[in-house]
UniProtKB/Swiss-Prot annotation:
Family matches, as InterPro entries: Luteovirus_Orf2 (IPR018019), Peptidase_S1_PA (IPR009003), Peptidase_S1_PA_chymotrypsin (IPR043504), Peptidase_S39B_luteovirus (IPR000382)
Stretches for region Disordered: 463-490, 595-660
One GO molecular-function entry: serine-type exopeptidase activity
Originating species: Poinsettia latent virus (isolate Euphorbia pulcherrima/Germany/Siepen/2005)
Protein's name in the database: Genome-linked protein precursor
Upper classification of the organism: Viruses, Riboviria, Orthornavirae, Pisuviricota, Pisoniviricetes
Domain of life: Viruses
Length: 660
């Protein structure tokens, strides 16, 4: 019930508002006083609802409805028909209704367009996802197909043509290694002297295509993309760069004053810069000279090179000097410099870089502008080439190298020497008489006796030093030769020497005495009959044989052949104890490694400094020329003490009063 009451009150309030709105819209003469008719309220409320944007179609409610009975009761006058309203009221009503209808249509269009745009965007997103997925699948399929093809090709080659494939791979590897070896050996000369490495298609295009249709086309100038040079204001070496201009004074190009190896001074430039009535401007002297006064004596149309001879003293007239040349056979990859004029008429040095070979020209990284043709490229103070232009197909400029002409652009040295026509002395005529005192052995002995070594000779050093400093200066006399074998037959001495060498090589010098005892027992030599000399030593290499004098020795049999030697070696080896030898060697080495070699007594060296003198005065003879008297050091590293404290007034000194 409460909700129904609220709804009824809302309907009555809306009807009252509609009535008030309609009464204000109608003329005041026809609608005087409030109207409480139910049908009028309903009609007005419907009209008001249509004005607020709600279209209601009710056939029961019309403009010609009879007057409500409530109006007579409430004192309301019946509403007037629509025909009685003015055109303004009707037009405003129609305009308001059209406005509301347009708003409704616009809202409907917005709703529909938003719905359709959402559908279209969703469809586009779905199609994009599908396209990306298909693209990825295509890439995967192509990639996997390439791997499968490579796998099948390799499987086929290894199955049916393994040897041929290995040979081809080995040849490719050898070719790459040979090319790298040639590049490493030749270096930069490979780009100019190895003509066989020039691409074949370039030569074919030059020979088969006409001049206008050639694949190698050139322009005059172009900047290189990506190359950043540095530019500084600087004049050319020897002021050798000359400006070329037209007859009206406008800029044409550049030329170079060069000095040839025959001593002449010539003008060098690009051939396309030689224009009729061209002038040479001398920036130093301010003079001009026409190019027609020069004679063209060397030209090359293939590389656009020209060399001209001028009148006498033309370089002095223009104020230039000749620069030296570097020909094409000595050019390599290196930084170079070229010179041009700025807008203010000042010379500028521009950096460039020679990168390689372009046919018979050189490729250069440089930034040039129209009018830079003919300017020279310098390596230090020498000219290496002339600026030509650029290629339409490549991203670099071109430089004209200087042709190698011996005697003109390069030196032609001829080494001349006199021929030898005979000897002044021969061996017989120049041979001098040499006495006994003049032999080489005599002078060698005298020289060795006169030399006193402060240290030992290399052959006199032992493994351990046990000598004092006084003994080091002495010369060790050579060992006396042993007198072993004086009473033995020569066959026996040779036999013992051979056996000693063999035993020394097999068992080493550690078991020398035992081996000698065994050998004497085998040969039947009595040990008591041998008188060894302890002060004498055997020669180096025969340490297994003891130096001794044999008194009585049985003569050996003449059947000393290889069987006896092999039997001796076999018996000696059987009696050897290798483990004991190895153990003793290890012990000796360990003992030597842990012991320190003794040293001689140390002595103080003599004083090398000059004696100090007491007092502050030192005589000039004892003064050191590179140092002065030592000043007193400060107490700390802080600020030095001032003569007067800060802020104190200084004494006037000898300043006159009139100055103060």
């Amino acid at each position: 019930m409460a909700l129904l009451g609220i709804k009824l009150m809302t309907l009555v309030f809306a009807a009252w508002l509609s009535c008030c709105h309609s009464s204000s819209a109608l003329p005041s003469s026809g609608l005087s006083g409030p109207c409480l008719n139910h049908s009028c309220l309903l009609r007005n409320s419907l009209n008001g609802a249509s004005q607020w944007g709600t279209i209601l179609h009710s056939p029961a409610v019309g403009s010609n409805c009879p007057p409500c009975p409530m109006m007579s009761i409430m004192g309301c006058s019946p509403p007037k028909p629509l025909q009685s309203n003015s055109y303004g009221v009707l037009c405003s009503t129609i305009a308001s209704k059209a406005k509301q209808d347009l708003k409704l249509c616009w809202k409907e269009v917005q709703t529909r367009s938003e719905m359709y745009s959402k559908r279209i965007s969703a469809a586009l997103i779905d199609s994009l996802h599908q396209a990306v997925g298909m693209l990825l699948m295509i890439i995967i399929w192509i990639w996997s197909s390439i791997f499968l093809v490579v796998y099948h090709v390799l499987a086929y080659m290894t199955t049916y043509h393994l040897s041929s494939a290995v040979c081809v791979g080995f040849l490719i590897f050898c070719t790459i290694c040979a090319f790298r070896l040639i590049s490493w050996i030749c270096g930069d000369l490979l780009a100019f002297n190895v003509s066989g490495l020039t691409p074949i298609w370039v030569n074919f295009s030059e020979s088969s295509c006409p001049a206008g249709l050639s694949l190698r086309r050139y322009k005059n100038e172009k900047t290189v993309e990506g190359y950043k040079p540095f530019i500084i204001p600087q004049k050319s070496p020897k002021k050798s760069v000359i400006e070329l201009s037209f007859s009206n004074g406008s800029h044409l190009g550049y030329a170079t004053c060069v000095r040839l190896w025959d001593g002449s001074i010539c003008l060098m430039t690009a051939k396309h810069c030689l224009v009729k009535e061209a002038l040479l401007k001398g920036r130093v002297a301010g003079h001009s000279l026409p190019v027609k006064n020069f004679d063209l004596f060397l030209t090359c149309d293939e590389i656009d090179f020209s060399l001209l001879r001028g009148p006498k003293q033309w370089e002095a007239y223009l104020g230039v000097k000749g620069a030296d040349l570097i020909t094409s056979n000595r050019i390599g990859r290196s930084p170079v410099t070229f010179y041009n004029l700025s807008k203010d008429g000042e010379w500028l040095a521009n950096s460039a870089q020679i990168t390689g070979r372009h046919g018979k020209l050189c490729s250069v990284l440089s930034n040039t502008s129209p009018g830079d043709s003919g300017t020279p490229y310098y390596s230090g103070k020498n000219v290496v080439g002339i600026h030509k232009g650029t290629s339409e197909l490549e991203n670099y400029n071109l430089m004209i190298p200087i042709p190698n002409i011996p005697g003109l652009t390069s030196p032609d040295f001829k080494f001349e020497t006199t021929n030898v026509r005979g000897n002044l002395y021969n061996d017989e005529g120049f041979r001098l008489s040499v006495g006994e005192d003049d032999k080489a052995e005599h002078w060698t002995d005298r020289l060795m006796k006169s030399i006193t070594f402060k240290t030992k000779r290399w052959a006199d050093w032992a493994e351990e030093e046990s000598e004092s400093d006084d003994e080091r200066g002495k010369v060790v006399p050579p060992a006396k030769p042993s007198n072993y074998g004086e009473g033995c037959p020569p066959e026996h001495n040779q036999y013992l020497s051979d056996v000693g060498d063999l035993l020394t090589k097999v068992i080493g010098p550690e078991q020398n005495e035992k081996c000698v005892d065994i050998l004497m027992g085998i040969m039947g030599v009595d040990k008591n009959e041998v008188a060894p000399h302890k002060e004498e030593k055997a020669e180096k290499g025969n340490e297994a044989v003891v130096s001794a004098t044999v008194k009585t020795v049985k003569e050996p049999t003449t059947q000393c052949d290889e069987d006896i030697i092999s039997e001796i070696v076999k018996r000696v080896v059987d009696k050897m104890n290798l483990k004991a030898i190895e153990k003793s060697v290890v012990e000796i080495l360990a003992e030597k490694a842990m012991t320190k070699a003794p040293r001689g007594k140390r002595k103080n060296s003599k004083d090398t400094s000059r004696p100090s003198t007491p007092g502050s005065y030192i005589i000039p003879a004892k003064r050191t020329p590179d140092s002065g008297p030592v000043e007193k050091s400060l107490n700390s590293t802080g600020r030095a003490k001032e003569e007067s404290p800060s802020g104190a007034r200084t004494l006037p000194g000898n300043i006159p009063a009139w100055v103060r």
